[in-house]
Amino acid sequence: MVHRDKILCFLVLFCCFFAHTPLQAQQPRKKVGLVLGGGGAKGAAEVGVLKVLEEADIPVDYIAGTSIGAIVGGLYAIGYDAADIDSLYRNQNWLFLLSDQVKRESETFLSKEEREKYIVHIPLSKERKVSLPTGYVKGQNIFNLFSKLTVGYHQVDDFSNLPIPFRCVAVDLVEGKEVVFSSGSLPMAMRASMSIPGVFAPVEWKGKMLVDGGALNNLPVDVAKEMGADVIICVDLSTGWKKKEELKSASSVVEQLISMMGQNKYRKNMAEADLYINPSLKGYSAASFQSEAIDTMIQRGEQAARQKWDELMALRKYIYADACDSVVSDDTLQDKRLKLPKPSQTEAYHIGSIRIEGISGEEEKWIRKKIALRENSEVSPEEIDGTLAMLRGLNIFSRVEYRQSNEEPYDLVFMLEPNESRRISVGARFDTQDLASVIAQISNNQQFSTRHHYAFTGRISRNPYLEMKYAYGNLFGAKIGISYRMAHYDFDLYADKHKLDALEFLSHSFAGFYTRDIGNFRLKSGVQFDYYHYHSDMFERDGSIQTRSSDHFLNYFASVVMDTYDRCYFPTRGSRIQVQGILHTDDGIHYADGNPFGEAVFQGECAVRLNSRFYLLPKLKSRFLFGSSVPAIYQNYAGGVADGYYLPWQVAWESAQHVHLLERNVVTGQLGFRYRVKGKFYLTALGEYGKEARKFSHILIGDDLWGGALRASYDFVLGPVSIQANYSSLGKNVGFYINAGFLF
């Protein structure tokens, strides 16, 4: 009886307990894993899917991503919502980010000159071996953007402790194995996961060479399951196998190769997804970063998710099937995301110490003087960006990146990697005047650690030259130097609308100089010995012939150049001004036993923005010769599209292809109107007017020069491509000209 009473009492207590504690309260909801696949620019569709998931109030407990999916997923994991990522996606200059370009206003004078001549720079290692790059793009711009977007997450012990636990996938080229990032630098993990082989340089990490995770696991469903996900929502950006006619670009070929490599795992992971979303992205590729394409792909991602709305609602019901009402009400996705911390892109924050890694103590002292940031101070994200741009613009580092500690005040570390001691630079161009031209240079002009700087430059063309230059001093300060240049000139000379002859001569120039670059200014002065050996007759402006077979001169020169253009070709703002004076002698004091003769040069031009497509491009140039006796070689020559191509003092006259002999005093003006038709395609109309006179005092009443040209151009990565038609009073005939490549 006592035993029966004890059992009865126990049953009563048991029932009372569960009467006040529902069984479902003991069961949490199911955990949701979001898997974001790779696909380059097509990742915009993932942003559209995120918008619908937020609208449907689908909770996200784990995120696993590959390539662009790692970027979208990584940002979502630290607090950015779909609207934030949408804005980031639309407002980026993707052409700049997916390159190693440096904004021209951040570059030094020397860097501007070299970048606007050469197509490729190949480092030479200390062992004098050619060191080819491991990828077309090092990815510094995109990495520094990731670092900016992930402040506070540069050194993470465990990605499981992020606001939303996160993993991303890369592939180790050394062992051919998949690497899943679960800790460390979040921006570095994102950058490694998107290192498309051959396009982006691999990321070196713990002895591994990491490339795009899509090569082995482009849809990491298995990774999300290992994290603990019960339910998998998968966004797949693939568009199936491309047909032969669709493989027309490098990006489409690389995309197809990556898809082929991970097919077995891809199919298995796709089959294990509880909800599979595959936006319709036919016609778009990993390189479709145009604003119109991004807008369309975001919409298509949203449409694809909305088409699954009923399945989303059923899935949400399944996720909460075993959970009580309080769990459901406390788990609203929108409320949870509002509570997530998110790095600010505009607010200033405090930094603590500043360290610089990768350079010597002497170099560090100089760099600290250059940067405007100070320890234990407040800085803005824009100031960090400006410092990075300045360091990259110096052109002496192959790597400029940074990291910060995770808590404010953030300790700031700049990670620098000096360039190789030497490099080979190569450029090429084609035009209808000289056909093909090639230029090559071997230099150490990108080495800050030495005070000895040299450059050997050669051009192969109808007018070839060889130049050797040595300078001693601070690379970005004052330098003294010497140079030698041997050049062969061969071009047709015209005067008064008629061809005089084909000029041909050889020149040797030896110079000693002082130069200093100060911001956008370059100061230069020196003395130069010129020797000319003529293989043809030299003509005076009146048609008379100079009978000498050679000439020699000892000249003194000084010049100031200011350049604030944002771009050398197709500038949208800024200006360029040059002022130069030269005194010519043949013995250091006299010329032809009389007084020396001199020249004064002024050139000024600018770009004026009228609206987003129209630009006004005025130019003014003049060259005045003073003295009773001026030899034929130093007279005024005009013609062609570039100053100094046929002779160092030849002035461009873009409405005439041939070189024309002018009077001793010349003033020319040009007014151009440039219209950007679409993207990188431009149309330009320009008019030219000038005056020439024997005497300086007669310049205003001198002979008229006029002309005009219409030009269609495309801003190609290997140099501008253009075709133009022109007419000038110098030739009185319609001319046509085609150019492809940088001018040099």
Model region roles, listed by residue range:
Residues R485-Y489, D530-Y532, V579-G588, R623-L625, ...:
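Short glycine-rich beta-strand segments
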Residues P381-T387, G393-Y565, Y569, A638-A652, ...:
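Gram-negative/organellar outer-membrane beta-barrel architecture
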Residues M1-R29:
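Bacterial Sec-dependent N-terminal signal peptides
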Residues G526, L617-K621, T684-L686:
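Outer-envelope exported proteins of Gram-negative bacteria
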Residues G672-L705:
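C-terminal hydrophobic structural anchor segments
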Residues A25-T66, G74-E382, G386-A389, G393-E401, ...:
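Patatin-like phospholipase
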